[in-house]
Amino acid sequence: MKTWKDVIGTEKTQPYFKHILDQVHQARASGKIVYPPPQEVFSAFQLTEFEAVKVVIIGQDPYHGPNQAHGLAFSVKPGVVPPPSLMNMYKELTQDIEGFQIPNHGYLVPWAEQGVLLLNTVLTVEQGKAHSHASFGWETFTDRVIAALNAQREKLVFLLWGSHAQKKGQFIDRQKHCVFTAPHPSPLSAHRGFLGCRHFSKTNAYLMAQGLSPIQWQLASL
């Protein structure tokens, strides 16, 4: 069984990666509030091991409000109101998955535990400043994560919502993997084709056609 350490462990020794961590450390040391907390920056990889990945949902950078980000794209900690993009994901789920009921939270850990890699392409952000760490070099790291999944796994589902995710996933081998694209679930664009995309049921149909168990998208209320 290959682990993330086997596949991308050497990235940690690369100068660019050390430079990322140095910049994040300097930001925290200077008194800036950086999300998510240090122990949660790599949560997506801890919760969804390399060989366990079935579905990859690509986000952008972490939420930049207090207590929101915890290392999984689109997810927020329990007790925090689900942000608008996630509410649109829930809205689509109610239309797409029979019986889906919107939970009272936005904590997507149960998805991660079933093999949904919730991958932001930038893994840290300064409080209140969207995209503030976009130039740190995280994109190089997450490009290599996606490249490793593309090359060393097969029959994955990639959900690419919005132009940023679609650009990030442009090199995915569509002969080996299933790629679904739609506008971003943000309120600015959801009505242009995210709502009605049926990506959640399409994902499960593909997985079942490969003899894999479907994702249970329903989240129990907390």
UniProtKB/Swiss-Prot annotation:
Enzyme class, spelled out: hydrolase
GO process terms (BP): base-excision repair, AP site formation via deaminated base removal
Gene3D superfamilies, sorted: Uracil-DNA glycosylase-like domain
GO MF annotations, alphabetized: uracil DNA N-glycosylase activity
Compartments, as annotated in UniProt: Cytoplasm
Catalytic reaction(s) noted: Hydrolyzes single-stranded DNA or mismatched double-stranded DNA and polynucleotides, releasing free uracil
Chief location of this protein within or outside the cell: cytoplasm
Pfam families: UDG
Signal peptide limits: none
Keyword terms: Cytoplasm, DNA damage, DNA repair, Hydrolase
Keyword check for Phosphoprotein: no
Assigned protein family: Belongs to the uracil-DNA glycosylase (UDG) superfamily. UNG family.
General function of this protein: Excises uracil residues from the DNA which can arise as a result of misincorporation of dUMP residues by DNA polymerase or due to deamination of cytosine.
Name the UniProt record assigns to this protein: Uracil-DNA glycosylase
